[in-house]
Amino acid sequence: MAFYGSSALRILYGLNRFSEDLDFSLLSKEKNFNLTPFNNAIIKELKGFGFEATMDTKIKNFDSNIESAFIKADSKKQLIIIDALHNIITSTHKMQIIKIKMEVDTNPPRSFDTETKFLFQPIPFSIKSLTLPDLFAGKIHTLLCRAWTIRVKGHDWYDFVWYLSNNIPVNLQHLKARLIQSNAWDKQLHFNKIELINLLAQKITITDFAKANEDISLFIKNTESMAVWSKEFFIAILATLQTIN
């Protein structure tokens, strides 16, 4: 199993914004994978650090490659445990529940690499993660395929800028595999940097970046860098996109 998604990018690689879910991927397809047997071990580990929580596996109403579960805990109590600032504790309602969504991809697209990362908090430990070019491929797949029926996900575009500003190339083979799996690309067709830029340009032209700005403001402290966001800005920075096969 490997860590991926925006939380992996924040925790392991220094993305400077808040994130929501904990996303993991199996290393190969496992149709019968079930998160439930892991619930007790996760709750026991959290309790070892003083956190009292419950974990419920989501019952799927339709066939899906994603296994989901929610870790739930009393928000105010956990803030006291971690010695949060007094004003944060007092402003938190005593009945407020914190929910952390955990998802596992049980049928990951091929053509990705992993690496081992080491962290020191809360204790020294290692964790397997998708590499940055593969994480970037996953983010672009999300940008191209996410169904924005409620709001524009500005944090996706924020991450896109982060990858470009850090000169991270996108793994084209992994991205192609993801697009094919989502029925967003014909596996018989060639896929290269030109096709990718065309797809991104099409997405940019139909994106409301004013709404994207509203969304990202929930995830970052300083919004000044988003003042430049516009269709023209994102079209221009496509020229800096790097790829690997």
Tell me what each language-model feature is.
Residues 19:
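Anion-coordinating catalytic cores for phosphoryl-, nucleotidyl-, and glycosidic chemistry
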